[in-house]
Amino acid sequence: MLFEFNVVDIANMKTLLTHRLSQSEIKQLCALTQGEHNDNLKEELYQLTLDANRRVAINALWTFTHFAADDNVWLFAKHDQLIDRCLKEHDTTKLRLILTLLLRQPFDEEAIRTDFIDFCFARITDARAPYAIRAQCIKLAYEQMRYWPELLDELRQTLEMISCEPLSPGLRSAWRQVMRKL
């Protein structure tokens, strides 16, 4: 079901997000919110990521994962808020999508959060955590720790430790990618 949007008809955004989205609908939402002149619509979409309706929140997060690089820059201002959400999120789908958004953001040496590094380490070593989340946390741990050789040594030791367990192809790929950089 395709929705036609215009600036005064933004209420349809939440309605659209209540059902399974097609690729065409995702593209429509991205087009609706693209450009700096639509930052207010990006903010509305972001607020829908916090919606009590799980489907709405997940679809809003999923839409952000499809943003073009130029529009993704808008999310950089939400960096700490996204990290805070990761630390508290219990829904694995929402967590995976938030981690995906964080993977598309820069991690500066001055703005590193040790609580998020600890979060990533806890997920990397948790054999019960979903493979996708573990793989994302491997990459995010590297992005945060790459400025400090002593932290990279700790990451290398952790990755060597988990290499003894059976790893999914996706987790093995993330492991290999980061080990090559170490």
Regions flagged by a language model, labelled:
Residues 3-182:
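Alpha-helical scaffold domains
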